[in-house]
From Swiss-Prot:
Pfam families: COesterase (PF00135). Signal peptide: none annotated. Monomer. It comes from Pseudarthrobacter oxydans. The gene is pcd. The active site is at 188 (acyl-ester intermediate), 307 (charge relay system), 402 (charge relay system). This is Phenmedipham hydrolase. The lineage of its organism: Bacteria, Bacillati, Actinomycetota, Actinomycetes, Micrococcales. Transmembrane segments: none annotated.
Amino acid sequence: MITRPIAHTTAGDLGGCLEDGLYVFRGVPYAEPPVGDLRWRAARPHAGWTGVRDASAYGPSAPQPVEPGGSPILGTHGDPPFDEDCLTLNLWTPNLDGGSRPVLVWIHGGGLLTGSGNLPNYATDTFARDGDLVGISINYRLGPLGFLAGMGDENVWLTDQVEALRWIADNVAAFGGDPNRITLVGQSGGAYSIAALAQHPVARQLFHRAILQSPPFGMQPHTVEESTARTKALARHLGHDDIEALRHEPWERLIQGTIGVLMEHTKFGEWPLAFYPVFDEATIPRHPIESIIDSDIEIIIGWTRDEGTFPFAFDPQVSQADRDQVESWLQKRFGDHAASAYEAHAGDGTSPWTVIANVVGDELFHSAGYRVADERATRRPVRAYQFDVVSPLSDGALGAVHCIEMPFTFANLDRWTGKPFVDGLDPDVVARVTNVLHQAWIAFVRTGDPTHDQLPVWPTFRADDPAVLVVGDEGAEVARDLARPDHVSVRTL
C-alpha cells in the first residue's frame, strides 16, 4: 500500500499525492491571503498551520474576467473557481529523497489580467518527469487586485512573485530540489515579470537562470500618476467619485468595472491592457529591460515570428481596416514616412490589418527583444530564438502567433484541446519541434546549456555574430539575418 506523501515545510506539513510516478502538491499557500486589510498590500509570509494540510487539490485562481465562450484564439485561459485567496503554488517532483535537483518555476502570462498557474496545460509535470527536476507553477494577483496604484502598496503582483520565490528558496529542498539551481520560465507577462524580478533586491538573489518567452519589453510601465488615473477610471465605472470606495467592493464588481476600463483605454491599433506595472522605487525603479540587460543571470530570450496578430485578428475594427485607415494610424508613429512604413511592414499580398500587427509586434516584442540580446551580448552570454511554426487557425492567417510555442516547450499538446490556435497542427511537426524545444528547456535548466542530441548547435548571440535559433516545421536552424533593418530604419526616421 502506498502511503500519502508528506513534505515538511517552514509553515507546516503538507500531504500530497502520487500521480504517474511523481509526487504532487497543489494549492500550497506561500503567503497570507490578500483579503481584508491585506488587499492591495505587499504579500506577507504565510503564518503557517498545525497538523498536515491537504495539498492534493488546486486552490482558487486569481479573480479575472472570463470571455463568454472563451477567446477565439486561446479558448479558456482562466481556471475557476476564482477568489482573492489565491496566493498558492503547485509542485511536481520525482522524489522526496533530499536530492539536489534543479528547479523550474513557471510564471504564466495573460495581459496582466488573466491566466492561472492551475491550468492543466501549465502543469510542470512534463519537465519534472522528463528532466528529473522539480517543477513549480505559481499564482499571483492580476488586474485590479494586482496592478492598481493609489490604494496601498504598488506592484503587489510583483511582491506576490517575490514571496513565492522566497518560499521556494526556503522549502524546495524538502521536495528534492536545490535552492541554488532555480530557473524561472515565463511567457509574455510572465517573462516581463522575470525581468522585473531581476532588479528586485530580494528576488534577484533567489534565481539563477531564466527563459523569457515573448517578453513585451516595448511596454512602458506607468508612473504612479498615470496608474492612479486608471484607478480613478475604475471607480468611475463602478459609480464612485472617490477611489476609497473600491475598498468595500467585492472582487466580482472590481472585475466587472475592469471591462469598462479596458474598453475606455484601448485605442485603435493598440494592444489592449487595462492596467500596467508601475514605476516605484521599492519594486520597479527602472524599466525591466535595463535590468535584464545588466543582470548576471543566464538567459534565453525569444519571440514568435508574428506576435502582433494576437489582439487584432478577431477585432473587426482593425481586421477590416483599409490601407487609408492604416496609413492614418502610421502617421501618428512615423509622420511623413507613413507610406514608407506601410511598405516596410507589408509583405506580398499582406492585408492592411497585418501591417498594424507587424508594427505592434515589432515594437512590443521583436525590436525590444533583439535589443536585449544585442546589448546584453557585450556583457553577458545570451541565446535568442524565433519560433516560426504557423497556427492553422483561419487558414494560417495569424502566422506564428503569440503563445504558439507553449505546447511545444511544455510537450503537452494533448492538454491544449479546445484551444483554437493549435487545432489541426501537423502531428509530425509537433513531434519534431517538441523534441527540439522541450529538451532544450530541460537542458538549460539543468546545465545552462540548451544543446542536446536533437539540437547539437545553439550558439550564443554576439554583436559581431547575431545568431538566432529559428524553430520551424522542419526543426531548428541558426540564422544571422533577423535584425529586420528595413523596420528599424523606418522606426528611427
